Amino acid sequence: MRLIPFKIESVTETLTEIPYGVKHIEAPKLWKNGEKGEGIVIAVLDTGIDRNHPDLVENIIDGRNFTDEGSEDDYSDRNGHGTHVAGTIAAFENGKGVVGVAPEAKLLICKVLDRNGSGSYQSIIEGIRYATNWVGSKGERVRVLNMSLGGEKDDELEAAILEACAKGIVVAVASGNEGDDDEKTLEYGYPAGYNECITVAACDENKKLAYFSNNSLQVDCIAAGVNVNSTYLNGQYAKLSGTSMATPHIAGALALIIGLGEKQ
């Protein structure tokens, strides 16, 4: 199992903006009504996170490393992908840098991929089950799970996803970047191919389907995935492209929807 290939467009040390993808899904409208994902825990199964990033440190609730890279408690990101995904979901609103879709949600970091973006199916399955059964110090439970990764079909992986769904966790996954810019071609990957998942394709700033985005009957929704600004390694920011970047927009949106529903 590997990261779905992505492209680094640029890296910068300073930035202040609400990324266009966050605006696309109209998250700021919910913020104005007081819904920012407070109390909602989102599990991020990826390459880890920059634990000291100023836009993320406030929202990391817990984490664990399931790779061979360091100790169980070392879920630091040595790739950049996981940090970028986490920022799109829940970068803290601190007046600088970027802000995520659900800026008051909490992040449970499950490092299942190493610095090269590789991980075993067993590591990913263990990460899913850890997130499914995790309980916070105040009784918090995971409500949303984000996986911006892909590989071959695996029955045990699907079983773990089914276990998560049975406990009320919504699973958002990337559709994949094997698209050929032909709407008639259908590209399939996994876990995107499982019916239990919300599968996310990518669009650009003009809301046009990205040329690289997988297009299949399993795609449920589309979100920004081209030149997406978010958090990156060493406290920096980066523009990345890929369906990996689209998926966390939906994970964050799900947190807002869940929070809103619980208040009504």
Please tell me what each predicted stretch does.
Residues M1-K7, T16-P19, E26, K138-L149, ...:
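C-terminal subdomain of the subtilisin-like protease fold in secreted/lumenal serine endopeptidases
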Residues L3-F6, T12-K106, S123-Y130, G136-R141:
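Active-site core segment of subtilase-fold serine proteases
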Residues D55, N59, E196-T199, N227:
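Glycine-centered tight turns that cap/initiate beta-strands
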Residues A86-I89, L108-D114, W134, G225-Q264:
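Hydrolase catalytic cores
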Residues L108, V170-A172, T199-V200, I222, ...:
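Structural detector of well-ordered beta-strand residues that form the stable sheet scaffold
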Residues V112-N195, N206-L209, N215, L233-P248:
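Substrate-binding/access-modulating region of protease and related hydrolase catalytic domains
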Residues C203:
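Carbohydrate-associated surface elements
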